[in-house]
Curated annotation (Swiss-Prot):
Belongs to the ATPase alpha/beta chains family. Its EC number is 7.1.2.2. ATP binds at G149, G150, A151, G152, V153, G154, K155, T156. It comes from the Bacteria. CDD domains: ATP-synt_F1_beta_C (cd18110), ATP-synt_F1_beta_N (cd18115), F1-ATPase_beta_CD (cd01133). It is found in: Cell inner membrane. This is ATP synthase subunit beta 1. It is a peripheral membrane protein. It comes from Nitrosomonas eutropha (strain DSM 101675 / C91 / Nm57). The gene is atpD1.
């Protein structure tokens, strides 16, 4: 039986290959080009021995009649500890010029999600050291978190800070999948990890903006497969994806190239299924856990767009970054009224944490309602209680800002890691009026409440 086929049509990244009728490849089989490093992945069987494939690499120089060999297996990538500290592409090949990976085991990138009876739920909290996140939308170990934000509000910087904090404090293994992001960010990220001495605990998989859609669509699965392998060894792994929107976008490009009819806003008709297939694999089993943090670009700041809206349903916590808060110079620009977490429940985090978080939100919500009155009539028209509310809300707003370790180069102020206990103590004090006499500038860009008191002395 012949496993050789020949190219009959090339349209951009979509290549049609003809095989003898008894040797037709299965969907998702990997095909390799003779005398070239290019791999094709079968997407459809068109009939008469012809299969439609997506090129995982540049299709420049391909022409009809070229020979292709069916490997009779899916794309497999290296897994295990040899991948740590290395940068790989969608096929698991090294792109850091540091020689072969040398992995002993390989796994196919398409796998089924763990069965229902293998799953395990966890309510253990993962402390991030970022005040606003730990207070308002705490993360669960083995949970899924989305960082939602438009262009330029700080998704990648937040993600890098989370990786740095968790990698240093949590000291487990991490896998980072760069899906359709800027190559410069990938480079910065690599050096940031190197400087923080956590590179030997991170496996990096990149399919950046300049890559063909096939690479960007599959690179998330490559990273996920590596994370699953660590989980199946009984470890607790962190899996970072930047950016899940580009995964959807690559799916849209591939879908259009394959000739499928687009659905709402031009997205692929299989959007929910593609997203579900990826997200359902990111889960914790009885052997180990995957805690996933995903950056989600929000097109035109519209959270109802089909791509972010589909992602919402899969997450345990959502961190929403707001342009309005960023414009006030408050970073991280997390919107405390829009961000949510399933863990913010008195049975999970305790009464003290829950009540403090809710009171912070109520104070900020009251300030939001009063802002129109203040804009029209000024502060003098408010009742004494409302004036106090506004003053505390402005302090809370500023206290939610924090200097980041990864942003030291830009800000010049050293990063701060604030423990959850310290965070709750600080916000509780503001709400109870313990710091009513301290000017609001003292609360801006500091770590714990002790620093506020120190800073306030310099204003006197």
């Amino acid at each position: 039986m012949s496993h050789q086929g020949k190219i009959v049509q090339c349209i951009g990244a979509v290549i049609d290959v003809e095989f003898a009728s008894e040797g037709i490849p299965k969907v998702y089989d990997a095909l390799v080009m003779e005398g070239s490093e290019l791999t094709l992945e079968v997407q459809q069987q068109l009939g008469d021995g012809v299969v439609r494939t997506i090129a995982l690499g540049s299709s420049d120089g391909l022409r009809r009649g070229m020979m292709v060999t069916n490997t009779q297996k899916q794309i497999s990538v290296p897994v295990g500890t040899k991948t740590l500290g290395r940068i790989m592409d969608v096929l698991g090949r090294p792109i850091d010029e540091m020689g072969e990976i040398g992995a002993e085991s390989f796994m196919p990138i398409h796998r089924t999600a763990p069965a229902f009876d293998e799953l395990s739920a966890s309510t253990e909290l993962l402390e991030t050291g970022i005040k606003v996140i730990d207070l308002i939308c705490p993360f669960a170990k083995g949970g899924k978190v989305g960082l939602f934000g438009g262009a330029g509000v700080g998704k990648t910087v937040n993600m890098m800070e989370l990786i740095r904090n968790i990698a240093i404090e949590h000291s487990g293994y991490s896998v980072f999948a760069g899906v359709g992001e800027r190559t410069r960010e990938g480079n910065d990220f690599y050096h940031e990890m190197k400087d923080s001495n956590v590179l030997d605990k991170v496996a990096l998989v990149y399919g950046q903006m300049n890559e063909p859609p096939g690479n960007r669509l599959r690179v998330a699965l490559t990273g996920l497969t590596m994370a699953e392998a660590f989980r199946d060894e009984g470890r607790d792994v962190l899996f970072f994806v930047d950016n899940i929107y580009r995964y959807t976008l690559a799916g849209t490009e591939v879908s259009a190239l394959l000739g499928r009819m687009p659905s709402a806003v031009g997205y692929q008709p299989t959007l929910a299924e593609e997203m579900g297939r990826l997200q359902e694999r990111i889960t914790s089993s009885k052997t180990g856990s995957i805690t996933s943090i995903q950056a989600v670009y929000v097109p035109a700041d519209d959270l109802t767009d089909p791509s972010p809206a589909t992602t919402f349903g899969h997450l345990d916590a959502t961190v929403v970054l707001s342009r309005d808060i960023a414009s006030l110079g408050i970073y991280p620009a997390v919107d405390p009224l829009d961000s949510t977490s399933r863990q913010l429940d008195p049975l999970v985090v305790g009464e003290d944490h829950y009540n403090t978080a809710r009171e912070v939100q109520q104070t900020l919500q009251r300030y939001k309602e009063l802002r129109d009155i203040i804009a029209i009539l000024g502060m003098d028209e408010l009742s004494p209680e409302d004036k106090l509310s506004v003053s505390r809300a402005r302090k809370i707003q500023r206290f939610l800002s924090q200097p980041f370790f990864v942003a030291e180069v830009f800000t010049g102020s050293p990063g701060k890691y604030v423990s959850l206990k310290e965070t709750i103590k600080g916000f509780k004090g503001i709400i109870n009026g313990e710091y009513d006499d301290i000017p609001e500038q003292a609360f801006y860009m500091v770590g714990g409440i002790e620093e506020v008191l120190e800073k306030a002395k310099s204003f006197q």
